[in-house]
């Protein structure tokens, strides 16, 4: 993995090429004229010295010999180096890929570009019609979290003003000298760390974006591009997220490959765990591993009761507090109490009558009695979820009804804890049933007959009998802010 500067572009090899006679070496009779044109366009784009009006000069390592370009391509992708357009080489050329040239070094920024601070802001200024805003928000958050899990960087979303990383979906010429070209051409591009356009990430609004596989997976593209926005170039490791060619990555349960971890930590160093010691009255000293206690944008991944304590999870840490007391609130690393979970708990709930709690992460869940894990992880499909559900956003146990509500995207399921069976006629619309909650539900917990829903930096108190929100607080107030 190499640091990068300048612009990075993720694209699918275009279908329109120059009709000029290609200057390629002789090939077998099976090699079609379309393959010649495709290869020439590919080599011109990724293995030839080019310039960019706002990006800076890109200097190729080698000469312009076509045979030499082919050999460079073959060497980069680990193919047999022949200088000929054999089948394996053409297979590589036809793959969707990122548009950063494999033989160039950008010169826009001196040295190895990286951010000089640990907390970066991001803002999504324009959305795509392919997905709901909540889905786009979630994809971006997950893509950034993939990187912050490995290095001491924190990402804070803002809704107005200029952010370090400005994210938008654009069409055609959008003012940065790198116009988009419509469906199945360039997918996205990102600028390396720096002032002005530095860090900005643009997605082609002409593409069909999705969180699944029926289109271009937004998480996959965003995670790759954010790697460039943080300062990484391409990797020659085919298993790496930063490998040049597009490869679908499942957003749920994704873990940054080792090569990417090595590269990003070379720039920013490893993320260090918090010591878990009690905090002073005004909060802990600054530590990049812990979200600022009184950050107005603080949100939680999961919230649950466990015995007489309330647990609130965020990234690699969780807070423990008494329900009716604000004193003694203390953060700890998740691994210190739940080593099997590591980090990033998706959802959690407790059935107090049984003395058991359930923790969800990706397509798996764990059962605990107190802080003691009860065996290995199990599959969430034990609950009766359809196979397309691959993670749970939030869960809350309703004591009187003896039912658990599971929130997945903009829908929710109802699970009968007595019958150990998912109820019929679900999922249902979360917005229709809980209309007072704005945004996707990240976490939920029932206390004293009320359901508290956490959505981003806000917590909503919902009266289950009136089916209405009765008050709204900042999520950070739950840890004493």
Swiss-Prot record:
Binding site for Zn(2+) 1: 98, 224, 228, 234
Cofactor: Zn(2+); Ca(2+)
Key words of the record: Autocatalytic cleavage, Calcium, Disulfide bond, Extracellular matrix, Glycoprotein, Hydrolase, Metal-binding, Metalloprotease, Protease, Repeat, Secreted, Signal, Zinc, Zymogen
InterPro entries hit by this protein: Hemopexin-like_dom, Hemopexin-like_dom_sf, Hemopexin-like_repeat, M10A_MMP, MetalloPept_cat_dom_sf, Pept_M10_metallopeptidase, Pept_M10A, Pept_M10A_Zn_BS
Residues making up the signal peptide according to the UniProt record: 1-20
EC number: 3.4.24.-
First-tier enzyme category under EC: hydrolase
Annotated Ca(2+) 1 binding sites: 162-164, 195-196, 198, 200
Entry PTM: Autoactivates at least at the 105-Asn-|-Tyr-106 site.
Any Gene Ontology biological process: amelogenesis
Pfam families: Hemopexin (PF00045), Peptidase_M10 (PF00413), PG_binding_1 (PF01471)
Catalytic center residues: 225
Main location: secreted
Hemopexin repeats: 291-341, 342-387, 389-437, 438-481
Entry's family note: Belongs to the peptidase M10A family.
Function: Degrades amelogenin, the major protein component of the enamel matrix and two of the macromolecules characterizing the cartilage extracellular matrix: aggrecan and the cartilage oligomeric matrix protein (COMP). May play a central role in tooth enamel formation. Cleaves aggrecan at the '360-Ser-|-Phe-361' site.
Protein name as annotated: Matrix metalloproteinase-20
């Amino acid at each position: 993995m190499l640091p990068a500067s300048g612009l990075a572009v993720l694209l699918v090899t275009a279908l329109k090429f120059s009709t000029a006679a290609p200057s390629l070496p002789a090939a077998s009779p099976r090699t079609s004229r379309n393959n010649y044109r495709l290869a020439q366009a590919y080599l011109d784009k990724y293995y030839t010295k080019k310039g960019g009006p706002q990006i800076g000069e890109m200097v190729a390592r080698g000469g312009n010999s076509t045979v030499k370009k082919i050999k460079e391509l073959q060497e980069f992708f680990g193919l047999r180096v022949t200088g000929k357009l054999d089948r394996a080489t053409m297979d590589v050329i036809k793959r969707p890929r990122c548009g950063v040239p494999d033989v160039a070094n950008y010169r826009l920024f001196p040295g190895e570009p990286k951010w000089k601070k640990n907390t970066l802001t991001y803002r999504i200024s324009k959305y795509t019609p392919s997905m709901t805003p909540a889905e786009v928000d979630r994809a971006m958050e997950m893509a950034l979290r993939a990187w912050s899990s490995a290095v001491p960087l924190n990402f804070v979303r803002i809704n107005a003003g200029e952010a370090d990383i400005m994210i938008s979906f654009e069409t055609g010429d959008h003012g940065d000298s790198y116009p988009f070209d419509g469906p199945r051409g360039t997918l996205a591009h990102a600028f390396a760390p720096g002032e002005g356009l530095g860090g900005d990430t643009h997605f082609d609004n002409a593409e069909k974006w999705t969180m699944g596989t029926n289109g271009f997976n937004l998480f996959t593209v965003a995670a790759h591009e954010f790697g460039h926005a943080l300062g990484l170039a391409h990797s020659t490791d085919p298993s790496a997220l930063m490998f040049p060619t597009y490869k679908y990555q499942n957003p749920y349960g994704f873990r940054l490959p080792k090569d990417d971890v090595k590269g990003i930590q070379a720039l920013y160093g490893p993320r260090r765990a918090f010591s878990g010691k009690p905090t002073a009255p005004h909060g802990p000293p600054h530590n990049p591993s812990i979200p600022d206690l009184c950050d107005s944008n603080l949100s939680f991944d999961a919230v649950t009761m466990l015995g007489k304590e309330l647990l609130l999870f965020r990234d690699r840490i969780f807070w423990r507090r008494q329900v009716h007391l604000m004193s003694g609130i203390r953060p700890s690393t998740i691994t210190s109490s739940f080593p099997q979970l590591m980090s990033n708990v998706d959802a959690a709930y407790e059935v107090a009558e049984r003395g058991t709690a359930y923790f969800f992460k990706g397509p798996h869940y764990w059962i605990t009695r107190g802080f003691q894990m009860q065996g290995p992880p199990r599959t969430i499909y034990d609950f009766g979820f359809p196979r397309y559900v691959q993670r749970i956003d939030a869960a809350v146990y309703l004591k009187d009804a003896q039912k658990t509500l599971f929130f997945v995207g903009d829908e929710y399921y109802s699970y009968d804890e007595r019958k150990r069976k998912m109820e019929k006629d679900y999922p249902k619309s979360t917005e229709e049933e809980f209309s007072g909650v704005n945004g996707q539900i990240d976490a939920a917990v029932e206390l004293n007959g009320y359901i508290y829903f956490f959505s981003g930096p806000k917590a909503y108190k919902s009266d289950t009998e009136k089916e209405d929100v009765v008050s709204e607080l900042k999520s950070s107030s739950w840890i004493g802010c």
